[in-house]
From Swiss-Prot:
The enzyme's E.C. designation: 3.1.11.6
Catalytic activity from the UniProt record: Exonucleolytic cleavage in either 5'- to 3'- or 3'- to 5'-direction to yield nucleoside 5'-phosphates
Name of the featured protein: Exodeoxyribonuclease 7 small subunit
One GO-annotated biological process of the protein: DNA catabolic process
Enzyme superclass (EC): hydrolase
Record text on subunit structure and interactions: Heterooligomer composed of large and small subunits.
PANTHER family xref list: EXODEOXYRIBONUCLEASE 7 SMALL SUBUNIT
Keywords: Cytoplasm, Exonuclease, Hydrolase, Nuclease
The species this protein was found in: Nostoc sp. (strain PCC 7120 / SAG 25.82 / UTEX 2576)
HAMAP family recorded: Exonuc_7_S (MF_00337)
């Protein structure tokens, strides 16, 4: 079983860490595809990649919500000027 860190920001990826997480996911995929890992290590690496993907997805969803709010604010400002 894979142990996960319990921290307040475990569900999010800091702005500077998004690219690092994506790079790590790509590295994990390369290690798995190389065929050189033992089966247990493959499962551990896969679990890590899934967790990183979940964190990246949460980060992107949060940023999408921020963008939607900004666009809505701009639209409201445009409509109030009419």
């Amino acid at each position: 079983m894979v142990k996960r860190k319990n921290s307040d920001n475990s569900d999010t990826v800091a702005h500077g860490n998004y690219e690092a997480k994506v790079a790590e996911i790509e590295a994990i995929i390369s290690r798995i595809e190389s065929g050189e890992l033992e089966l247990e290590a493959v499962f551990e690496q896969f679990a890590n990649a899934v967790e990183y993907l979940r964190q990246c997805d949460t980060f992107l969803q949060q940023r999408q919500q921020q963008m939607d709010l900004l666009i809505e604010t701009l639209n409201d400002e445009d409509n109030s000027e009419l």
